[in-house]
Amino acid sequence: MVLAELGGRITRAIQQMNNVTIIDEKVLNDFLNEITRALLQSDVSFGLVEKMQTNIKKIVNLDDLAAGHNKRLIIEQAIFKELCRMLDPGKPAFAPKKAKPSVVMFVGLQGAGKTTTCTKYAYYHQKKGYKAALVCADTFRAGAFDQLKQNATKAKIPFYGSYTESDPVKIAVEGVDRFKKEKCDLIIVDTSGRHKQAASLFEEMRQVAEATEPDLVIFVMDSSIGQAAFEQAEAFKETVSVGAVIITKMDGHAKGGGALSAVAATKSPVIFIGTGEHMDEFEVFDVKPFVSRLLGKGDWSGLVDKLQEVVPKDLQNELVENLSQGNFTLRSMYDQFQCSLRIPLNQLFSMLPGISAEMMPKGHGEESRVKMKRYMTMMDSMTNKELDSPNPKIFNESRIMRIARGSGRLVREVMEMLEEYKRIAKTMKGIKIPKNGDMSKVIPPQMLKQMGGMSGLQSLMKQMGSAKDMMGMFGGGGK
């Protein structure tokens, strides 16, 4: 999860407060001091933290609370409210509309990941049914057009740029005009990365904006910038009308609080966060679910949406039907793994209540992906009868040896995969799938109860030899 360390510290502070028998002034102050330290060490500006602490003390006046009030709940609600206030500028960003051309211009410092973010933004909207296109107006950085071209080709997004033209304004105008004629409804213009001191580059950025008349200017910010974020964002806002912000590299930097809070202070809403290098590691930033995850409360609606997003509708219906009848075959597991590989593990677990990304061992996600791919290779060497049989007893010695030879794996690895299938099948068969296919009613209470509640889920995560077990279960759950 983004800001894993901060989220873990806040969650632990809440748990410690909940373990105290009586909530008095000392307990409240200790709790607020721990939250304050956590926020400051994550680069949230001192002024914002001090204001938040003052507001919480006004809301939670222990002397005025009657004996029957749930003080813990009131404190948690106050923390939630103030964190939301800190991160929400109070105004929505421009949203592109289909069948109407919208021009979105990307600006940012050098090295913030702007070009990659342009492609992620286009890819996200393309999946939503938009006809997106990319224009490379970055003539300053060597290899900029090559990078955009490579990214766009991989994502199957049309693009425009030039190896010979050096005027970024001309390229931007030509690209926008071309894609408007081609009836694209989302045209994204990538500009040169700048330094705050580079006045000429800022003038170039202003000229591109003036010539293309973008509907939205997005400022791309590196999460590691810390408390310098406010100053940098102000420099860009003074040159062009920044309407929204995307924060990148939130997967690898514990101190992303400065970027989040300082950008919110400039009154430009954060609309997306980049959580990894892959094209799908790009999350919509919604303040309330984000704060809920930060406080360890999870985000069930986000989890269900994410699972349903990566699972084709026909496959959802097929698996719901099979699971409702108690059928979980190797083919079901194969389909499950395919979908699971599309969801980064850190995103998945950050949406579970009581779970912190700190609980995920470093490198565990990649290890699980490798193991899933290895198992899928073995299943590729199976017959249709073997894949569709709900009875693992059909795998005798000769079948196992044939699968091992066909997949280039060891016999013991095939046997390990079959044992894994039995474990996951047992878990999946214990989950009651409604025949109407409403997956939002599947995950929360029932699954947690079958795992022994939240404490059982946390214990399972700590003891797991492979995070794939959980990934498999939730991949199937979403289907």
Swiss-Prot record:
GO molecular function, one term: GTPase activity
Main localization of the protein described in the UniProt heading: cytoplasm
Catalytic activity from the UniProt record: GTP + H2O = GDP + phosphate + H(+)
GO CC terms, sorted: cytoplasm; endoplasmic reticulum; signal recognition particle, endoplasmic reticulum targeting
SUPFAM superfamilies the UniProt entry points to: Domain of the SRP/SRP receptor G-proteins (SSF47364), P-loop containing nucleoside triphosphate hydrolases (SSF52540), Signal peptide-binding domain (SSF47446)
EC top class, as a word: hydrolase
Stretches the record annotates as M-domain: 296-479
Keywords per UniProt: Cytoplasm, Endoplasmic reticulum, GTP-binding, Hydrolase, Nucleotide-binding, Ribonucleoprotein, RNA-binding, Signal recognition particle
Organism superkingdom: Eukaryota
Pfam families with a match to the protein in the record: SRP54, SRP54_N, SRP_SPB
Subunit structure: Component of a signal recognition particle (SRP) complex that consists of a 7SL RNA molecule of 300 nucleotides and six protein subunits: SRP72, SRP68, SRP54, SRP19, SRP14 and SRP9.
Free-text comment on this protein's domains from its UniProt entry: The NG domain, also named G domain, is a special guanosine triphosphatase (GTPase) domain, which binds GTP and forms a guanosine 5'-triphosphate (GTP)-dependent complex with a homologous NG domain in the SRP receptor subunit SRPRA. The two NG domains undergo cooperative rearrangements upon their assembly, which culminate in the reciprocal activation of the GTPase activity of one another. SRP receptor compaction upon binding with cargo-loaded SRP and GTPase rearrangement drive SRP-mediated cotranslational protein translocation into the ER. The M domain binds the 7SL RNA in presence of SRP19 and binds the signal sequence of presecretory proteins.
Protein task: Component of the signal recognition particle (SRP) complex, a ribonucleoprotein complex that mediates the cotranslational targeting of secretory and membrane proteins to the endoplasmic reticulum (ER). As part of the SRP complex, associates with the SRP receptor (SR) component SRPRA to target secretory proteins to the endoplasmic reticulum membrane. Binds to the signal sequence of presecretory proteins when they emerge from the ribosomes. Displays basal GTPase activity, and stimulates reciprocal GTPase activation of the SR subunit SRPRA.
Family the entry assigns: Belongs to the GTP-binding SRP family. SRP54 subfamily.
Protein name: Signal recognition particle subunit SRP54 1
Organism whose genome encodes this protein: Arabidopsis thaliana (Mouse-ear cress)
Taxonomic lineage from the root: Eukaryota, Viridiplantae, Streptophyta, Embryophyta, Tracheophyta
Gene name as annotated: SRP-54A
